[in-house]
């Protein structure tokens, strides 16, 4: 599991810390890149602004995407991810506290691979993150990197 990058897109520092703690507690030792808003997430993925020197042929194995964020919300980020040849096959899991059915429907309509509501209880949250890591980083077969790196 350990050389696959996870992109965590989360604006809430408490939720970021909980997610990172839950990943470590679940023995997910992958590198986690944190983007604190939607614009930063896209900058990372496409190697723009502060990420202009990043090797964009190296894409995350998994993106954990919050929905309610400043600058650009998660649904708009997802729209951009799916519209670009380099990232359209990138596994994206929406990890949000939103209980709005319209977010769920729109997330899947825009191409989310999964939609997980963050449990309030840390033990349940840790368990959810453990299952998430096991499935997406161990069991799931991701698209070939060659397909995602093409532009």
Residue map of PLM features:
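Short, glycine/charged-rich "phosphate-handling" switch motifs in NTP-dependent
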Residues: 113
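C-terminal output helix
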Residues: 40, 120-133, 141-146
């Amino acid at each position: 599991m350990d050389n696959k990058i996870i992109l965590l897109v989360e604006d809430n520092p408490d939720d970021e810390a909980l997610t990172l703690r839950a990943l470590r507690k679940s023995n997910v030792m992958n590198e986690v890149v944190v983007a604190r808003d939607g614009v930063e997430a896209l900058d990372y993925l496409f190697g723009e602004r502060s990420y202009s020197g990043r090797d964009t042929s190296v894409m995350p194995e998994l993106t954990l995407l919050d929905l309610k964020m400043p600058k650009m919300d998660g649904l708009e980020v997802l729209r951009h991810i799916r519209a670009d040849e380099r990232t359209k096959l990138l596994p994206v899991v929406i990890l949000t506290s939103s209980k709005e059915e319209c977010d769920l429907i729109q997330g899947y309509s825009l191409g989310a691979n999964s939609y997980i509501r963050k449990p309030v209880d840390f033990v349940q949250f840790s368990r959810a993150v453990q299952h998430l890591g096991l499935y997406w980083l161990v069991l799931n077969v991701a698209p070939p990197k060659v397909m995602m790196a093409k532009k």
